[in-house]
């Protein structure tokens, strides 16, 4: 029986398989998750401003998303600024105010 309530179960299972996590990594503050369809989420934490972050898993191209948050180094800081630029498929460059740490996450497709 390959149907269930009008659904082709083989098609449904094949669709769900692409969301399976096939590889993970976690060491210190660096991590990644790779899904069967090539989707990759990776992130980490950086403590210096004005540096290039190299991805553990290179993306297919620059069509990925980066999100980030700043952690103040001192309680007297009253505002934050984060600039992400110079995107390549293997890295990105960021700047922020001195004394802050960056927690970042990138999401996109890698070549399998």
Q: Which residue stretches match the model-derived regions?
A:
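A signal for long, low-complexity, Ser/Thr/Asn-enriched, surface-exposed stalk/shaft
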Residues: 1-22
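Extracellular attachment/recognition segments
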Residues: 27, 32-112
């Amino acid at each position: 029986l390959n149907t269930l309530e009008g659904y082709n179960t083989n098609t449904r299972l094949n669709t769900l398989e692409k969301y399976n996590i096939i590889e993970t990594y976690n060491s210190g503050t660096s991590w990644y998750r790779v899904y069967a369809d090539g989707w990759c989420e990776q992130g980490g934490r950086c403590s210096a401003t004005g540096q290039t972050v190299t991805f553990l898993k290179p993306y297919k191209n620059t069509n990925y998303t980066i999100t980030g948050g700043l952690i103040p180094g001192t309680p007297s800081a009253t505002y934050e600024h984060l600039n992400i630029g110079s995107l390549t498929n293997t890295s990105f460059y960021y700047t922020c105010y001195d004394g802050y740490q960056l927690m970042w996450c990138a999401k996109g497709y890698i070549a399998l």
